[in-house]
Amino acid sequence: MSIIFQLALIALVLFSFVMVIGVPVAYASPQNWNQSKPLLYLGSAIWAILVVIVAILNFFVI
C-alpha cells in the first residue's frame, strides 16, 4: 500500500508542476482560449481526483 501511495503522490506532484506551467500559458494566449478551456477543466478535474486519491491512500498508510 505504501508503494501505491508514493506513486500517487509522485503523480500528483508532477501533474501539479505541469499545471503550474500550463495554466498561465493557456490564460495568456487569448486566441487559443476556446481550445484551452476544455483542457483546463480536464486538468483541474484530474488534479482534484489525484488529491482525493492521495488523501484516501494517506488514511490507509498512516
UniProtKB/Swiss-Prot annotation:
One of its GO terms (biological process) is photosystem II stabilization. It is a multi-pass membrane protein. It is found in: Cellular thylakoid membrane. Its main location: membrane. Gene3D superfamilies: Photosystem II PsbZ, reaction centre (1.10.287.740). Belongs to the PsbZ family. May control the interaction of photosystem II (PSII) cores with the light-harvesting antenna, regulates electron flow through the 2 photosystem reaction centers. PSII is a light-driven water plastoquinone oxidoreductase, using light energy to abstract electrons from H(2)O, generating a proton gradient subsequently used for ATP formation. This is Photosystem II reaction center protein Z. It comes from Rippkaea orientalis (strain PCC 8801 / RF-1). The gene is psbZ.
